[in-house]
Amino acid sequence: MEAVSDASYGFRPGRRAHDAVLRAQAYVQEGRRFVVDIDLEKFFDRVNHDMLMGRLAKRIADRRVLRLIRRYLEAGVLVHGVVIERHEGTPQGGPLSPLLANILLDEVDKELERRGHAFVRYADDLNVYVRTQRSGERVMTSLRKLFVKLKLRVNETKSKVTRATASKFLGFSFWVASGRTIRRRVAPQAIKRMKERVRELTRRSAGRSLAQMCRPLGRYLAGWKAYFRLAETPGVFADIDAWVRHRLRAVQLKHWKRGKVMYRELVARGMPPDAARRVAANSRRWWRNSAMALHIALPNRLFDELGVNRLAC
């Protein structure tokens, strides 16, 4: 059986997303400052079954296994209680789908290797690193033709040739530090999505207490930190920590609602009466109030104890 490309990451032992990001960083550090960023339109929904089975037949001799895979691909989808036949695509979230994607896209990998290109692919996320914009445009043109051959469609809106520092890959982007050293950071889009998720988790609903909000929030942030620990921008993590705690303080103020309740709770937690009175006098301005002297009544230590550990630690 022909070996899978070394540039293929994801759903393979010892080839995680972090490994793919590190390899991409190395290519940019070597001077390949432009990237051909390919986005395949609804990839898992558009995989051609006959095309995929033809590739599998070259690797698998057992016809019984091939028949099972064909049945897996053609299994109907339950939509509003009705089974819809599937004529293309692989089951979303299915355990075999990522592996089948790697097999289908291996042809793309081999062609890029044959041409000597520096590239990284993680499932259907493909980045090719080149030295000039013109080289990137040529690669983009050839890849469009290759994907048409595989009956796949390039998303022209999202695919582009751009500077590597202006692109993102698997949630990370790159920046140039002193000495022209390439560093990793969390892509702005990933930070935006994270903040949207934090807002969802900290919405006041069903009368949840601050402690009840913090439990799922802490789990989410722990997972987020575990993935993005590869970033080389500790200041960004510190800023996010401050924003999260600002958000939690605002949520708690909103929970107290009325000025009298707010004043009583703040004083009970150690805030000087004059400061508590100023906050309570503007009881409807939760976000602004939560940036004041509230760190006395609701210190960072409280959120640590509630399970919202800091990203910057």
Model-derived segments and spans:
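C-terminal, active-site-flanking charged/polar segments
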Residues: 136, 146, 165-170, 243-254, ...
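Extended C-terminal regions of large enzymes
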Residues: 247, 256-313
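Hydrophobic/basic alpha-helical segments
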Residues: 196-212, 242, 294, 299-302, ...
